[in-house]
């Protein structure tokens, strides 16, 4: 049996726009992982950061509560070493609100940031082609 997905729906004189919760979750994940001090998403099944984010990993690391025209977000992250948990948490909240409201036009009611651990090794840098 497939899981029921929620949609954010907006309607105007031209018709309607339906945005899947998977799309919102992907926006949240991208915004959170771009914040300085975030090592990656916390993937509870493996208890590790993931550099390549799959839909399964997003669904375990980002939870949405859709209520009418606004949403509540919970995001589970790992902190990089030598960063302030409070500062990173606030930066993640700001980044998520901005990204979701700009990209999807949806009001974000709240962003709960769960810092599930600290990674002591350096974050791998993407390979640069020459």
Regions found by a protein language model. Name each.
Residues 1-85, 90, 106-112, 116-118, ...:
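Contiguous, often N-terminal, cationic amphipathic patches that form binding interfaces
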Residues 88, 98-102:
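Amphipathic, hydrophobic secondary-structure cores in small proteins
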Residues 92-96:
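A short beta-strand micro-motif common to beta-rich folds, especially ectodomain repeats
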């Amino acid at each position: 049996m497939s899981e029921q997905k929620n949609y954010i729906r907006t309607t105007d004189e031209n018709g309607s726009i339906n945005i899947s919760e998977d799309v919102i979750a992907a926006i949240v994940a991208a915004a959170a992982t771009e914040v300085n001090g975030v090592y990656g998403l916390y993937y509870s099944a493996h208890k590790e950061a993931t550099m390549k984010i799959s839909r399964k990993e997003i669904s375990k690391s980002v939870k949405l509560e859709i209520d009418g025209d606004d949403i509540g977000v919970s995001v589970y992250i790992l902190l990089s070493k030598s960063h302030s948990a409070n500062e990173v948490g606030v930066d993640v909240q700001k980044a998520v609100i901005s990204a979701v409201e700009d990209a999807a036009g949806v009001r974000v009611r709240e962003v709960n940031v769960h810092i599930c651990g600290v990674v002591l090794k350096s974050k791998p840098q993407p390979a640069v082609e020459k």
